[in-house]
């Protein structure tokens, strides 16, 4: 969502805006470090295109994917942050030709995120939650969204071209990929692109829902008043 990158762009010194493939790529610096920022768009194909352009045209040497996701375990609550250590495309199924979840012709099921980026992201998010969150988001706003004591987690991400918001969808993923702790629609696809190009990646998401139709919040309010500050806190910390 555009709101999720607005705060990054506000703090970024934008030197150039490149438009290609119906996308805008903001080129410049954050805290004097060169970077490129773009809206990935929604879904596996859209985000893969964005990632490929980042790598091919702008020669980025690492990628950070941020945004929101659905939680898949009791421990991962709305308002928490999750850093992916690895990812799987939960809707990839070419059986009987290839095993379920395996990417055809790559012989890969699980894409591992860069360990250094994972640790940097985890530390940045933990510092933000512990020391800076209330500078951006009031306790009253957090309480209104039923966010009480945000935590940071690390674990398996699953991605697919469908919004997971019903109990049958939720239970299917939990049964087939029991180690997964959060779900969204882009990260594992970008991970495949980064795997093929050998570019380090980390995926970091804040939890906006429980992916099971039970716990709901005002999504737009969450994005506008909470999630975008999480995103900026992550980026600011990793750019230090």
Per-region residue spans from a language model:
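N-terminal short beta-loop-beta anion/metal-coordinating cradle
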Residues: 1-52, 58
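Active-site-proximal beta-strand elements of phosphoester/diester hydrolases
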Residues: 36-40, 154-158, 204
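Glycine-rich phosphate-binding loop signature in dinucleotide/nucleotide-binding domains
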Residues: 54-61, 197-199
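Structural motif
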Residues: 62-64, 181
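Mid-sequence, gly/pro-rich, charge-dense loop/helix-turn segments that line enzyme active sites
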Residues: 73-177
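A C-terminal functional module that forms or caps the active site or interfaces directly
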Residues: 158-213
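His/Asp/Glu-rich mid-to-C-terminal helical/loop segments that flank catalytic regions of hydrolases
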Residues: 211-240
């Amino acid at each position: 969502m555009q709101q999720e990158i607005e705060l990054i762009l506000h703090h970024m010194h934008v030197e150039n805006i490149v438009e290609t493939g119906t996308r805008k790529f903001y080129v410049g610096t954050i805290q004097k470090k060169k970077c490129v920022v773009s809206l990935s768009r929604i879904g596996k194909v859209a985000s893969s295109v964005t990632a490929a352009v980042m790598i091919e045209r702008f020669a980025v040497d690492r990628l950070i994917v941020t945004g929101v996701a659905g939680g898949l375990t009791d421990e991962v609550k709305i308002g928490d942050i999750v850093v992916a250590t690895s990812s799987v495309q939960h809707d990839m199924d070419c059986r009987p030709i290839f095993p379920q979840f395996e990417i055809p012709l790559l012989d890969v099921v699980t894409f591992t995120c860069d360990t250094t980026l994972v640790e940097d992201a985890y530390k940045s998010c933990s510092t933000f939650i512990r020391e800076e969150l209330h500078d951006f988001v009031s306790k009253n706003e957090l309480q209104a969204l039923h966010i009480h004591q945000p935590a940071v987690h690390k674990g398996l991400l699953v991605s697919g071209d469908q919004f997971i918001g019903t109990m049958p969808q939720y239970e299917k993923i939990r049964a087939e990929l029991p180690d997964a702790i959060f779900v969204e629609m882009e990260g594992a696809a970008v991970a495949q692109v980064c795997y093929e190009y050998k570019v380090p990646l980390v995926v970091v998401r804040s939890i906006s829902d429980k992916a099971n139709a039970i716990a709901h919040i005002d999504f737009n309010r969450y994005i506008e008043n909470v999630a975008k500050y999480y995103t900026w806190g992550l980026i600011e910390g990793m750019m230090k």
